[in-house]
Amino acid sequence: RSTLFPYTTLFRSTLMPCCPAVIDLWCEKPVTFPVISETRNNLSTAFLIRDNLVKLISDQGLSVEQALLDGLYILLELYKNQPITNAHIQEYFSGHTLNKLNTAMEDIHIPDEDTFIECNELLQDLSVNYRKEGLYTAFLQPVLTEACKYSNIYSQSDDNSMSRTLQTSQKQFCSMLTDYDIVFRNYLANELFSDLISPEAASTKKIIEHMIIKMQWIMIEYTAIRQSLFLWYSHNANSPLTYETIREHIVIISRMTGYDDDDIREYLENSFAKLIWDWGYAALIMGIRK
């Protein structure tokens, strides 16, 4: 299934990840997107930023989490340092700048359990209304049961053995997740291409603000998918992850997070201290491992 988004002079068609057949298209080779020529200066800038972000998520030399964190950091810097030019954008996305950024990230340590607890809470919060309405029950029930189990364990125990057990289980899970790396990269590249640009945003500052908000939402989507998959894996006695399981989680979480722009903005304003996060919060939910 595809959806059309109008611009003043063009239409763009994108595939929707809430359809299983679309995910099937993404499991073999990198997805490609049309090159769009735009003469209006503010949208030309937006297209350049978006193209670089898509290129970043497609770079297999970076983990998915690292690419998302790099992308958000650059967007936040561009937002703070107005006005910007195409030369500024190219400099931020240059190999030299990215190497410095990723080297700096190596000195950051966020405990795995802190990331796990926050991701658990994010997934539970996203699921509240669907549970009330009795939607996606067969999918959510085992996942959220497992989430509650871990929440209770962490609230009642300071035992380091729990942390070690979680780390071992997560290491095994992450190893299996890498088998489907191309699916996640294609999913995220499509989200970036289809969602980052708003034709309604009049100024460059507003365009970049919109990009930051949508990037945060994409990070929430990815976090929810990854967390739900880990909880499924834990609930099913560490059973191997299959492609069908990966696809189901991407499809259902995509349906659950398919909010329009106003609803996304409202959700972020109601759920977080600030509409635009500090970069450190993104690092918390993505996880930074040495």
Model-derived regions, located:
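Charged, amphipathic alpha-helical linkers/stalks
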Residues: 12-100
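Hydrophobic, aromatic-lined core segments that form the binding pocket/scaffold
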Residues: 62-290
